[in-house]
């Protein structure tokens, strides 16, 4: 069958056409590692194609074993492009090949010369492959109508003439190897259908074609159709008021005495979780991990990671500001004084040039950090933490001043960082990634410098210094043109070096801010592009798990969750942070999907929160309001001896999860303009 365009409409024909954009093959049959047509393999393949409107088609395919013998096979649906794509995508896995980054995560279309085949549950759209050029976009993806249709895998093959083969494998296959852990490859994984003589199998899949909304953005067109393909019918597990109570309860537990002062620690975990994650150079073999999983001393909660971090995962500054908001609301002077003291402790460490170590504990480890190289991620100042730090300090200064407390050192903290990056902005690489304490650029790669944009704009709101706003506008143009406009962001998740979704956050926020400040429509387009990119990492459907999995036992589902990065194939509740920004997009564009997606991400971020003191996960009572950071939906893990336990939780109860939800609620009113939190109720 040929898909072609006639009078502006997409149509199917059995006749070969020069105007065709794609060709749908009958079912292929893989047996003994060889692909055959259904006819040659002794199978009958019949299709029924439903036109769902606006270039979306559902293919219902029925396959019959006519060979007269029982067959153990894989089935393969194949769609061939009749155009030459310039970009390709497998959402949450491959963004035009993941050419940025030096790790051993998947890159390109092949491994050792053989095409990658990835399971559906690694992708936000099941078994989705997308190719595009300036004029046409084409996608093939699985249906969730039944388990045979959903439990699939996807592959893309580039042919010598530049055209592509989109493939869906039935059932699940991971080949030629399995990406099973951080930068780790293990043996391939195979499932098969066993079909007796005369037995039928019916499956469904989707084909989508479009003219890309913007160049490199056919994914935006595809995402626009997802609500009708995978309808969202859930609601929030808790009211917003209860979310605030639970989150604040947990964050207060993280106030930690440290060398005569109080700081905010990054989280609580078990000793085994700490070792599993590979912190402090620990390397556990699978055998050691299995042994330690049975020892009580390694499986009780405590403060096993002494981490005090400005932003990123620890979110110490944001947590302090949220405590100040809570203290002011409740007239809790002790809590307010504690939060202010914590920020004073941090501010005292900053150098005149604005540089500061983003991890406070490293001042104790190395009294002269300028004399030591970056021994681990985050040792030296990097733009993710510096951006968060300056942004939050500016907001803290404004909040306290509004409530009668002048803390000029907090504003000075923010302006020092902003002054540094105004002076050191590069037209070649923006704000860079890693800096020395002396102010020398150590690593200029990636998109992570975008976090400085929020710092500049938030500090401008307090100081009205035009150089901050001007530099932010210039830098946003740079990062959009170099990165976001090409549907990629890199290195915002500073524990990995890969294409990721976190780095899109500052571009969404700063673009919306500049749109509201200037009224320039280009910034609204910027915000939409960055938001579409971010949402390409969101799960549009619920993957399937056995009853014995953590996901099934504790009521976790994937729809609305966000994949972490091309290096870390797991889900986290990061989308909660973008909830108010998607509400802003809804208000500015009038497009209802932004509100729907905001609610999807918000609702999903509430799954796994401990709502009653002493609730147990993995047999361990968890603190009220806590939630684990990682949800491992596919055959990838850092927290199990092997990757086979799909659908498990880790035990790292980190602070940013609560901090992001609470700041989202605060911004829903303070920034998005809602009167209260009822929009998320």
Regions found by a protein language model. Give the residues of each.
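Exposed, low-structure sequence patches enriched in small/polar residues
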Residues: 529, 573-583, 593-635, 639-649, ...
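Active-site lining segments of carbohydrate-active enzymes
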Residues: 369-380, 394-466, 528-536
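Alpha-helical junction/boundary sensor with strong preference for TPR arrays
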Residues: 330, 350, 400, 418-421, ...
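Carbohydrate-recognition beta-sandwich/jelly-roll modules
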Residues: 2-412, 416-419
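Glycine- and aromatic-rich loop/turn segments at beta-sheet edges
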Residues: 247-308, 348-378, 421-442, 480-498, ...
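Well-ordered alpha-helical scaffold segments within catalytic/enzyme domains
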Residues: 8, 317-333, 388-406, 451-466, ...
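Aromatic-lined, polymer-binding surfaces characteristic
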Residues: 442-453, 483-485, 495-508
